[in-house]
């Protein structure tokens, strides 16, 4: 039975109890917020992942790791190494592959992932249409629906569905003076299909049937933002907001049918607009979980977009965003390496925690207080073992050899904490 249906009947399931323990929130709050659509369990009921992951109101901010091949670089072994990184640092994982045997790659990623896995089904149907029909926009509506069903049968837990994009919005955005008309790959594929076939969005036309499929597997619909801003100068224009309004209507219908749903957000957004972007989305959708890409507050940061976007991500998290989609140093430049995936993942783990200190307060800040206590006492092993990345921290601590004094090699014998402890002893005598 779908978890929303259980919650509506007043049933607190084992999954709800586990979420309650992990997140330090009462089981009844979990149940009630699932009913309201404000908390969701990211899963495919028939193929549950090893890690239980819930997102939403009152829960810690989660981090999504994107991996996948491209038409230029197809290396399954490398992508499976990225899965290991995702298992270590992430909460959810998306396979965005566009090159190679897409069915094989997806199934191998799901097999090796401990996390719920997401996909963008239009990628596969567009690419296969391009290969077999000499054009990406030649796929049929049945091709798209069959691909969604295949992904669900394989165990995909959530999918980006660009159902908020209308034909009118797409055409007006393409004709507009936007700096970059469309930057969403899946969104542009749907736009191209609508224009080529002179037809409305196939997701919208088949929305009720899509809801039935997701309900059958109790999987999650992630409503994509096809017209998200790809430049800070395009943020919050009529096209982004127009699509969000359409998306809000779809959220309501999904929840009415008992389908778990979240909304995807930008993108490139100036720093001063990030907080109210989150608040606007929550207001329009009734508070369903928000899954943001960054946001990236500048356009000039590559190859440091993992750093620039982590700044925006921390603000988004603090403002109420629930799932952060990471960026890597390769963003806007290249397919990322394994090392770049880990750099991005760590940056976003930090951003999520920084936001949670604001959003959730003491129950997450206790971790920081413990580290600070050990730091103040110069208890290095305890302090380092409590950090976000103990292994790397120890390497840095000993990079010039073990310190000759109790302090580290930065301050040495002039360490204020070492002196302060001695001063405390003197004034206490």
Curated annotation (Swiss-Prot):
The keyword Chloroplast does not apply. Belongs to the ThiC family. The keyword Oxidoreductase does not apply. Zn(2+) binds at residues 268, 332. It comes from Sulfurisphaera tokodaii (strain DSM 16993 / JCM 10545 / NBRC 100140 / 7). GO terms for biological process: thiamine biosynthetic process; thiamine diphosphate biosynthetic process. Its EC number is 4.1.99.17. GO terms for molecular function: 4 iron, 4 sulfur cluster binding; carbon-carbon lyase activity; zinc ion binding. Pathway: Cofactor biosynthesis; thiamine diphosphate biosynthesis. The lineage of its organism: Archaea, Thermoproteota, Thermoprotei, Sulfolobales, Sulfolobaceae. Substrate binds at residues 66, 94, 123, 162, 184-186, 225-228, 264, 291. Binds 1 [4Fe-4S] cluster per subunit. The cluster is coordinated with 3 cysteines and an exchangeable S-adenosyl-L-methionine. It catalyses: 5-amino-1-(5-phospho-beta-D-ribosyl)imidazole + S-adenosyl-L-methionine = 4-amino-2-methyl-5-(phosphooxymethyl)pyrimidine + CO + 5'-deoxyadenosine + formate + L-methionine + 3 H(+). HAMAP family: ThiC. NCBIfam families: PRK13352.1, thiC. Its cofactor is [4Fe-4S] cluster. Catalyzes the synthesis of the hydroxymethylpyrimidine phosphate (HMP-P) moiety of thiamine from aminoimidazole ribotide (AIR) in a radical S-adenosyl-L-methionine (SAM)-dependent reaction. Keywords: 4Fe-4S, Iron, Iron-sulfur, Lyase, Metal-binding, S-adenosyl-L-methionine, Thiamine biosynthesis, Zinc. Pfam families: ThiC_Rad_SAM. It comes from the Archaea. [4Fe-4S] cluster binds at residues 408, 411, 415. It is an enzyme of class 4 (lyase). This is Phosphomethylpyrimidine synthase.
